[in-house]
């Protein structure tokens, strides 16, 4: 029987719609100090890793020690995953790492695999001791991974890995704001290799300018520009012709959790042109949900957009 492997962290990001009233989400900022994590250095503070089988599919815990065991006392959520297009057995996952459940201080955790998710290596966190949230990872057509995260000052860093996620280069300042998202153009067209970062405008660096672009492989980032309808708490996607799409809830005047929007840029792919956008409201029904388990201090999902290729 062929076994399909599913990787698992502490939460799954989906478009969550339901019945309820919209409410404001608090921006991310450190409010508790880091907590000691003695269990990480104690080989006895371990338990069997969590696995779950459902038919031919098996989920595998990724935030494990060097021997594949669960580390007691820590936690993780808000995972993001990317697959190397040149070697699908190579994947990278990013998440918010809580070294101790006694503190909500989070850092940038990650793990990588070279055997299609059967085994994972969790080396630690990026720039230890730095408050990091909203991690997003993506990969370009050449197999270079990019990891973007939000710091406590509402500015983002972007890291680059040329060895499959084993190690990362120095952080590159990338403007930013709360609940950021990242996408890389892998179309092979004029915009191939472009990186795009977006965020909400209510806890951010640059007012109503909420999207930045890199045309230099993430080494530099351009001055942010506005996006029609200001999609909030959503994601990005690149179409086969390089058209850039952004989706989320309407951020025109406030965080309208019951109004969903999609914005589109046909010229963002052109490195010599400042991106412009048009946008529209789309009827999805219901509300994006906030609070409650498993993430009582954050979103229960995001607005997701995807394009067929």
What are these regions (language model features)?
Residues 2-10:
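Bacterial N-terminal signal peptides that target proteins for export
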Residues 9-18:
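Bacterial N-terminal signal peptides
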Residues 23-309:
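C-terminal PAP-associated
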């Amino acid at each position: 029987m062929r076994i399909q492997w599913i990787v698992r962290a502490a939460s799954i990001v989906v478009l969550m719609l339901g019945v309820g009233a919209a409410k404001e989400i608090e921006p991310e900022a450190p409010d508790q100090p880091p907590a000691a994590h003695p269990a990480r250095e104690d080989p006895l503070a371990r338990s069997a890793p969590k696995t779950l089988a459902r038919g031919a599919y098996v989920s595998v815990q990724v935030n494990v020690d060097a021997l594949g065991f669960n580390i007691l006392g820590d936690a993780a959520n808000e995972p993001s995953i990317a697959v190397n297009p040149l070697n699908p057995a190579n994947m990278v996952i990013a998440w918010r790492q809580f070294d101790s459940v006694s503190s909500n201080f989070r850092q940038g955790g990650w793990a990588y695999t070279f055997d299609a998710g059967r085994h994972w290596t969790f080396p630690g966190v990026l720039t230890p001791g730095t408050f990091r949230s909203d991690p997003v990872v993506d990969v370009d057509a050449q197999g270079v991974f990019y990891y973007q995260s939000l710091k406590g000052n509402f500015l983002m860093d972007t890291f680059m890995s040329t060895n499959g996620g084993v190690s990362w280069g120095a952080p590159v300042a990338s403007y930013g704001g709360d609940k950021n998202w990242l996408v890389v153009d892998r179309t092979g067209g004029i915009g191939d290799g472009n990186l795009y970062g977006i965020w909400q405008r209510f806890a951010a660096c640059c007012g109503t300018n909420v999207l930045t672009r890199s045309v230099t492989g993430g080494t530099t980032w351009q001055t942010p520009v506005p996006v029609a309808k200001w999609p909030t708490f959503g994601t990005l996607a690149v179409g086969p012709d390089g058209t850039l799409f952004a989706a989320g809830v309407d951020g025109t005047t406030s965080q309208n959790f019951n109004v969903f929007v999609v914005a589109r840029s046909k010229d963002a792919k052109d490195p010599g042109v400042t991106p412009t956008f048009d946008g529209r409201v789309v009827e999805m029904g219901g509300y994006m949900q906030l609070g409650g388990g498993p993430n009582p201090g954050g979103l229960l999902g995001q607005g997701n957009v995807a394009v067929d290729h």
